[in-house]
Amino acid sequence: MSVFKFHQALALADYMGKQQQSLNFELTIKKEDLKPDTYSPLRDSFPQGGFNIDIADLLNYTLQQSDNNACDILFQYQGGVDTVNQYIHSLGVTDCAIVCTENDMHQDESLCYQNWTTPLAAARLLEIFRKEALFPQEYKDFIYQTMTECQTGQDRLVAPLLGKEVTIGHKTGTGDRNAKGQQVACNDIGFVLLPDGHAYSIAVFVKDSEENNQENSRIIADISRIVYEYVTHQ
């Protein structure tokens, strides 16, 4: 689900670095880019299209608000899902696949299962992002800051860390209910920086759950709490 917008952001930064393009580079958004019946604060703000927006703002929409139209606009700009998939695999993270756009998945709900990752692969990718110089620092700093300001999923990984002296950057993913009434996905991945300089990455995925959405988020929050207490010896 929308966790893959983190993967997309890394591939985008690599592409822009090679093209020597600034985050202020602007794209023209047409009305047909703003699909109806999908989650899109971008469309809600500019329903008629016909405007320019820079890459930085589009990343804010995808990483902070999980905007589906902004995601597909960026896919089109950077060369499609295959480009993202190949880039992530080139980093040695191969237990994942990104083959469908947001619009693909909204046209056919079953396609969402074709975009997948193991939790370990997602956590490894977070560690690679934190520790390695994948692309120019300005892109890394921007993605890092944007993830720490994520507005979605405050009841998941973040919940047990509120009030703690930590910095957390994360990206959520939320699926609809399938024909069986199960929530297809309730996900959250993130990195946590501790005040003593240590850090860890965490990925928690709840798949095809018959629990309500609030309970699925609580499961993620409980695991986040347990990991934090283990790492900090509490």
Question: Where is each model-derived feature located?
Answer:
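Active-site SXXK
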Residues: 1-27, 62, 202
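Extracytoplasmic
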Residues: 1-3, 22-24, 93, 163, ...
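Short amphipathic alpha-helical face segments that pack within enzyme cores
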Residues: 6-11, 121-124, 222
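Short, well-structured active-site flanking segments
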Residues: 14-34, 81, 136-140
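Active-site-proximal beta-strand/loop segments in catalytic clefts of secreted hydrolases
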Residues: 30-32, 63-66, 77-78, 100-101, ...
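Conserved catalytic neighborhood of penicillin-recognizing serine enzymes
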Residues: 34-73, 81
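Mid-domain, small-residue-enriched loop/turn segments at the edges of structured enzyme/sensor domains
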Residues: 51, 72-134
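Structured C-terminal helix/loop/strand segments within mature extracytoplasmic catalytic/sensor domains
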Residues: 76-77, 81, 124, 128-156, ...
